[in-house]
Amino acid sequence: YNHQDVQITPDIYQAYWDKSIYSLEQIIRSPSTPANIYTNEVMRKHNIKITMAGDLGDELLCGYPRHRRVAADQKIKTWKDLCRYFVLGGKPAIKVNKNLIPKEEVLDEFIKTFSDVMWDEQDKLNSFCLLELVTVCPEDFLNRNDKFGMAYSMEGRYPLASKTFMQYCMAIPSTEKFSKFQLKNMS
């Protein structure tokens, strides 16, 4: 095992901006994409062929500050409330369409796509995390790692994305996943 730190400088970040967009074939709302693609290049130069990613860990184990906010939000009482928070809350949406599509219409389409079968009124935070797992994770994380790996002829593996492990984590009540003082209580 030969660990190597990868340093990301402002010059590297700028130099890999266009390559990250080209490889993804789209712009996504992640400021880390230039650093991610550069890291893939460094791995390839060290003859790495298969990469292991820890993606999904935060979503499975309530590791983000937003998870604490969801748990504390008293306005989230229904699936629609949770979807409203997910679609309209959190990070502000980029005004790509100049708001031509009303936000409520976007919310209605989202709810048609993702049914309330994921809603657990006893654990709204686990419901939120499950929603992240079926939306953000495949669209952003898995897609990004797959395309960046392909750009350098590497294959990405996602050990936390196994069905068994995901079901295990989602069966743990969210109250056990973080404490009042610490996110990622279980990691």
Model region roles, listed by residue range:
Residues 1-128, 144-187:
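ATP-dependent adenylate-handling active sites, centered on carboxylate activation for C-N bond formation
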